Amino acid sequence: MKPDDCLNNIHIETENLDEVDLTKLTGEAHSLSNGIVPPFTDKTFRKATSFKQKCATYVLALRPWSFSASLIPVALGTAIAYRSGGSLDLLLFVVCAVAVLAVHGAGNLVNTYYDFSKGIDHKKSDDRTLVDHILEPQDVVRFGVFLYTLGCLCAACLYFISKLKLEHLALIYFGGLSSSFLYTGGIGFKYVALGDLVILITFGPLAVMFAHAVQVGYLAVTPLLYAVPLALSTEAILHSNNTRDMESDRQAGIVTLAILVGPMFSYMLYNLLVFLPYLIFSILATRYTISMALPLLTIPLAFSLERQFRSQNFNKIPQRTAKLNLLVGLFYVFGIVLAPAGSLP
């Protein structure tokens, strides 16, 4: 064989290899142009999407629309401390808010777990986290334990960065934590018509006193009095929820205040809880400072809720009542912050 023939053979083989490689590359490019994602990319995308959906599911299980009931008392207690002392520690406020939110969220999960275990939640319930198998019971338990642990860690941080005595901090914080669990777990205050009392105390005076004490370093009675209108507004959220679920709760064999008093008195009680705070704000505005009249701006929404409740259209009424609670609370906090020094009792 001549040297030229060898060179020709080598050239031909090289061309064949190039043809194979080009065919493979062309095929892969064609697949990508048709939207076919390589396997490793598809798996990564699915994992990322699944993680986002899981996070969204956990957030929804917390019922975030109800968090105004715990955030506003913390803001109110902090505002009272600021108005009385003239100083505000933002770090204390943030840690306190996270601690209270963690306990509130954990309490919501405990409520979800026990309502499902007792057969109270069903396909038409507002909370179908476990009914629709969005989460498994063990997922709810683990998430609840995590939130209670987070709350305790925040309480420990407050001990080191606040001047409040340990016994006072533990008394208020663990009192609130116990209430959030025993509302449906353990004793189950919700099931024996005592849930309204627990909510009235925990998400009113107790939370406001806790936030105030963390800022000033001691316990005081004054925040308890300021907490009354906010506590009534917060209780209206629970009462509207219990009135809506009256029939299903009765069939499940549990007793709530709404069941005890009946539809007519439930309507009257709801009006009392919604409108009595406005009377208190009017008295504060006329006797002390006009800034206390700010919450009166929400009266149109209150009358809208009254009409909806009277027509027995309970669709989304707990959420709308929570919105009213948020607005009333925010205007109340602004009213205290804007009040002239020494004008408040």
Swiss-Prot record:
Instruction: Look up the domain of life of the source.
Output: Eukaryota
Keywords of the record, alphabetical order, are: Endoplasmic reticulum, Golgi apparatus, Membrane, Menaquinone biosynthesis, Mitochondrion, Prenyltransferase, Transferase, Transmembrane, Transmembrane helix, Ubiquinone biosynthesis
Recorded hits in InterPro entries, A to Z, give:
UbiA_prenyltransferase, UbiA_sf, UBIAD1
Q: Where in the cell is it found?
A: Endoplasmic reticulum membrane; Golgi apparatus membrane; Mitochondrion membrane
Q: Give the chief site where it resides.
A: endoplasmic reticulum
Q: Which family does it belong to?
A: Belongs to the UbiA prenyltransferase family.
Q: What is this protein called?
A: UbiA prenyltransferase domain-containing protein 1
Q: What is the lineage of its organism?
A: Eukaryota, Metazoa, Chordata, Craniata, Vertebrata
